[in-house]
């Protein structure tokens, strides 16, 4: 599933292609996604101008020149947004086609259909946005804040930093990498982390996310940026997906670990 850097990459790629463009038509080709597509609600976008594209956690928000409605998008497991010439042949899993006034169209493509593409009332937060935690790249997201969340919590630290109600946008890839670079076992109870360890972990999270955004996100099987190019941060990954290989720090063998039904990778020697 795309994590924060992938969604941020998508946002940055879409902005110059969509902002100030007018929507001339909306074609809903398959109504069944995570939540059914509402063709009538989406038709309200016709004749509207796209004014801005923002991100909250792993969600994209497409704002238009109406104050009452906006579009909320989640890419799910395999979703992508592409801006293509209107003459480009329509693909099987192009579920929504938004025609623009410049000869191009925005297409939502999602083979697994776990994504979300919905119109919502912009004057109040969508229910999926109401209880989200702090953005990890905000200045207010510090090691001290993380340490406060760890207090008296027996939950594994790997699960805590992926809890979207605490810190948003961090998935298994960046959690695995940040814990390795911080020397912290992913299965340690959060309450056992010191303030210094939390500071180190948060610093690594920020560094990893910033670097991944700069490089266009992590190459996942189903992720690509709006221009169709895959991200290439995977070349920089240290341990994620490398169980059974040698640790890049100490040379010992990296091991798998199952936490809350999610697989992670760590070095038993380097991570304590």
Curated annotation (Swiss-Prot):
Metal-binding in keyword set: yes
GO MF annotations, alphabetized: 8-oxo-7,8-dihydroguanine DNA N-glycosylase activity; class I DNA-(apurinic or apyrimidinic site) endonuclease activity; damaged DNA binding; zinc ion binding
Lineage, broadest ranks: Bacteria, Pseudomonadati, Pseudomonadota, Gammaproteobacteria, Cardiobacteriales
Organism: Dichelobacter nodosus (strain VCS1703A)
Annotated InterPro entries: DNA_glyclase/AP_lyase_DNA-bd, DNA_glyclase_Znf_dom_DNA_BS, Formamido-pyr_DNA_Glyclase, FPG_cat, MutM-like_N-ter, Ribosomal_uS13-like_H2TH, Znf_DNA_glyclase/AP_lyase, Znf_FPG/IleRS
Official protein name in the record: Formamidopyrimidine-DNA glycosylase
Protein function: Involved in base excision repair of DNA damaged by oxidation or by mutagenic agents. Acts as a DNA glycosylase that recognizes and removes damaged bases. Has a preference for oxidized purines, such as 7,8-dihydro-8-oxoguanine (8-oxoG). Has AP (apurinic/apyrimidinic) lyase activity and introduces nicks in the DNA strand. Cleaves the DNA backbone by beta-delta elimination to generate a single-strand break at the site of the removed base with both 3'- and 5'-phosphates.
Annotated keywords: DNA damage, DNA repair, DNA-binding, Glycosidase, Hydrolase, Lyase, Metal-binding, Multifunctional enzyme, Zinc, Zinc-finger
Superkingdom of this protein's organism: Bacteria
């Amino acid at each position: 599933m795309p994590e924060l850097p992938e969604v941020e990459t998508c946002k940055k790629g879409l902005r110059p292609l969509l902002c100030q463009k007018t929507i001339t038509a909306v074609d809903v080709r398959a109504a069944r996604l995570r939540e059914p597509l509402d063709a009538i609600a989406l038709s309200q976008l016709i004749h509207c101008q796209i004014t801005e594209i923002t991100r909250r956690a792993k969600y994209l928000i497409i704002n238009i020149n109406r104050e009452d409605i906006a579009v909320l998008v989640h890419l799910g497991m395999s979703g992508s947004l592409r801006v293509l010439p209107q003459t480009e042949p329509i693909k099987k899993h192009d579920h929504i086609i938004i025609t623009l006034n410049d000869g191009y169209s925005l297409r939502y493509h999602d083979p697994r259909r776990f994504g979300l593409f919905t119109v919502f009332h912009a004057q109040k937060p969508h229910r999926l946005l109401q209880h989200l935690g702090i953005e990890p790249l905000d200045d207010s997201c510090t090691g001290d804040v993380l340490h406060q969340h760890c207090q008296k919590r027996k939950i594994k630290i790997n699960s805590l930093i992926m809890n979207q109600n605490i810190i948003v946008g961090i998935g298994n890839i960046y959690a695995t990498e940040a814990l390795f670079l911080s020397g912290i076992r992913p299965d340690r109870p959060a309450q056992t982390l010191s303030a210094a360890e939390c500071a180190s972990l948060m610093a690594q999270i920020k560094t990893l996310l910033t670097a991944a955004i700069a490089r266009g996100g992590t190459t996942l099987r189903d992720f690509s940026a709006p221009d169709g190019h895959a991200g290439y941060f995977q070349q920089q990954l240290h341990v994620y997906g490398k169980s059974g290989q040698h640790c890049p720090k100490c040379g010992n063998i990296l091991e798998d670990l199952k936490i809350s039904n999610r697989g992670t990778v760590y070095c038993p020697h380097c991570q304590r």
